[in-house]
């Protein structure tokens, strides 16, 4: 994908950048002129990303480690753009939900977003920089899905966190929005939804009749990061083919 938006000279941090949506966002921002720091807990993914796009600065870090995150993200900044993409999906029936699933999911999907955003926003404010933050949420924040009790809950919490962030950071010229995709055809998405019966049941609920491609989500993120959306904050951009209206 060749983005037609310019981020020349702007500093960007992308979490969960080793694979899928986060990786594609990091590459797209780099091609659009941004100075990108790509964060992942998997060193091999970062190594292959840097080979693909040598201008990217890798940052290997587990966001569940609060103190390490404070030190590493603080030292890597300041940033003007932030994409909180890192997430886990530990799917279990409600009656079998484990403490481990709850703690890990909220650590990564909610607590890490709050913490990274605090670090980055404080630096933006200290530097007098306007900025944009995009939190990658999900249609699951607004629609119950079987076996998704914890995941749906973390994404719902993320949506409300984003709205409060938008309210409190707006006076500092920092915009905060979410993108809320349906199933996305990342490598993992293609594997998880390869069963025709399972995928057909979901696609039948999507008016456009298809799952999202990675570029569909990347384009939405780039728009929300860009000055093209200068008056947009506190919003959730649905990238769901109409799933939520069906």
From Swiss-Prot:
Amino-acid positions noted as binding substrate in the UniProt annotation, renumbered to this chain: 138
Chief localization: cytoplasm
Entry keyword annotation includes Cytoplasm: yes
Post-translational modification: The N-terminus is blocked.
This protein's UniProt keywords: Carbohydrate metabolism, Cytoplasm, NADP, Oxidoreductase, Xylose metabolism
Role according to the record: Catalyzes the reduction of D-erythrulose to D-threitol with the concomitant oxidation of NAD(P)H to NAD(P)(+). NADH is less effective than NADPH. May also catalyze the reduction of L-xylulose.
Name of the featured protein: D-erythrulose reductase
Species of provenance: Gallus gallus (Chicken)
Organism classification: Eukaryota, Metazoa, Chordata, Craniata, Vertebrata
């Amino acid at each position: 994908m060749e983005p037609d938006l310019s981020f020349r000279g702007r500093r960007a941090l992308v979490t969960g950048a080793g694979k899928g949506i986060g990786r594609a966002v990091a590459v797209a921002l780099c091609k659009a002129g941004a100075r990108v720091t790509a964060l992942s807990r998997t060193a091999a993914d970062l190594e292959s990303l840097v080979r693909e796009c040598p201008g990217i600065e890798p940052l290997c870090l587990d966001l569940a480690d609060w103190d390490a995150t404070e030190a590493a993200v603080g030292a890597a900044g300041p940033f003007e753009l932030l994409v909180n993409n890192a997430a886990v999906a530990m799917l279990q029936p409600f009656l079998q939900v484990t403490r481990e699933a709850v703690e890990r999911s909220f650590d990564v999907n909610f607590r890490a977003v709050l913490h990274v955003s605090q670090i980055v926003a404080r630096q933006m404010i200290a530097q007098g920089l306007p900025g944009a933050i995009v939190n990658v949420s999900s249609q699951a924040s607004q629609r119950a899905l079987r076996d998704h009790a914890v995941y749906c809950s973390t994404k719902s919490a993320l949506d409300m966190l984003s709205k409060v962030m938008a309210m409190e950071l707006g006076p500092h010229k920092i915009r905060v929005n979410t993108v809320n995709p349906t199933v996305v055809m990342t490598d993992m998405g293609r594997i998880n939804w390869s069963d025709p019966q399972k995928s057909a049941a979901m696609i039948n609920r999507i008016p456009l009749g298809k799952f999202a491609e990675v570029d569909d989500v990347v384009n939405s993120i780039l728009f929300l990061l860009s000055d093209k959306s200068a008056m947009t904050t506190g919003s959730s951009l649905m990238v769901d083919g109409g799933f939520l209206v069906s």
